[in-house]
Each structure stands twice: as C-alpha cells, then as structure tokens.
Amino acid sequence: MVATKKMQNKITAAAKDVLLAPVYLYQGHKIKRDTVRLPEPNGERHGQVQLNNSPITSKGKSNNILNLMVVGDSAAAGVGSQTQQEALVGHLIPILTEQAAIQSAFDTLNWSLQATTGHTSFDILRRLYVLPAPSQPIDVMVLSVGVNDTTSKVSAAQWQQQVENIIAIAQRKFGVRELVFLSLPPMAQMPAIPAPLNNFVGAKAAILDNSLQQICATHDNVTYMATNFARMIEEHSNGTPIDIRVMFASDGFHPSSLMYGYWAQQVAELIVKLLDSSTTKLSS
C-alpha cells in the first residue's frame, strides 16, 4: 500500500514537471541571462600556520603536521565574498587554529584550496587525477560538490559513480585520512531561483544529496556533513526574524560572507571531532 502510494506520488510529480517544463525552461534561461556573475575572490589558496609558537625545523617542517585540503566548486572557492579571508577557507583556518584539540595535537597546519566555479563531480574527479600526489598524506579533505551536477544533465547513476571514484582517488592517491562531503544547500530557498523552478531544482538536489549521504555511509573514514542552515539563521537572528537573503550573496545564489563564517564553524567542529575519533582508534 505504501509502495503504491509512493509510486502514485512519483507519477503525479513527473506529470506536473512535464506540464511545467516550458515554465522551467523560461525561468532557467532568465536566470542565466539576468543573474550577476560573481568572480572568485582574490587571496591565498595555500599556506602554513605555526601553532603554539612551535619551531620550524631546517626543512621548514615541525614534528606534527595537520594537512588540510578543501576541494570543490564555487562555494569552496568562496564566490560571494570579496576576499578569500571572508570565504569558507578564510574563516575555517583561524577557527581551526584556535581549537585547543588542534593546538595540543599539532605543531603546524598546512592547507590548500583546489576549487573552481562551475565544477561538477566529473570536473572535480578530473582535477584530482591531474593534481600531483602530495609529499605527505592529506589528513582531512573537505569537498563541496553537487550544485552544478543539479543544474546540469548529470543523472543519479552518473553522480553516484563519480562520487565513488572521487572517494577512491582521494584515499588511494592522496592518502586521505578523513574525507568530508558537505551536504548540498537547500536550493529551493535560494532567492535567485523563482517558483516553480525552485521546487524542481530543490527536488533534484535532494535526490543527489540523499544519494551522497548513502554513499558516504558505506565507506570507512568518509563522512557526510549535513550543514545546519537552521542553526546559522538561529545564531544570527538571536531570536528575532531576519531576511534569509542576508545569508546569500548579491547574486541570490552563492553564500554571503556571513554564511561562510557560520558554515566554517560547523566544518571546524566536525574536523575536530573526526580527528579526535581517528586518533583514539589509532591509539587503541
């Protein structure tokens, strides 16, 4: 009975999408024509931070190094902010270096950003193939992927295969200790996408996001991070109503610097938790 009802709902939704296809097409073209194209922010895309005033050896390295790599699309690249300091990585690095657990476990944080606007899961996979293997294994790799797959003609099967391949190359070539996939954003809430197109795009994003979550659950040391957007709004509003558009950049599509800050906080919390857990496993 339940299965029959689900099938009926799918048929109804499919029929609705067929009827609304001309509207979706018109709105999609209008968005491409009218939406402001924001550039990737200027700023450093790699760096080294010394923790606890730890000395650097003659080779430029200290004893315990945390190697962090952020990979992905325009959100990882920080589009929507003016500089990399105001972007996801720019917020993430100082938050991480202030964590007592990071300071006690590591002397140095090496970080790099490998992200490009418009990249799909296939583009990211290709980038990981092209990049040289690191001289040291990557302790944490954070991936932002899926939005461009949602807006392109990537099937659910293609998405699943490409995510699996990303996991394989990250672990094999980069020696990734902890791999974190960030959840897809709530695309139906993006100010730049009008109704009814927003619901159509949001539904496809949800399908890819659910698939991503399931894939991550089948692999060791691969984590799906469900970004808590409600928490971001609650922390910013402090109990008073706010316009959700403050969380988005001027294009109504990418995160604002404000959202990047809240997002980075959640990513940092997860990284600390994962490193603590993996260190405990290694020592037991």
Give the positions of each predicted feature.
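A short helix->loop->beta-strand "cap" motif at the edges of active sites that frequently abuts
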Residues: 174-178
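Histidine-centered active-site loop/cap adjacent to the catalytic His
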Residues: 245-284
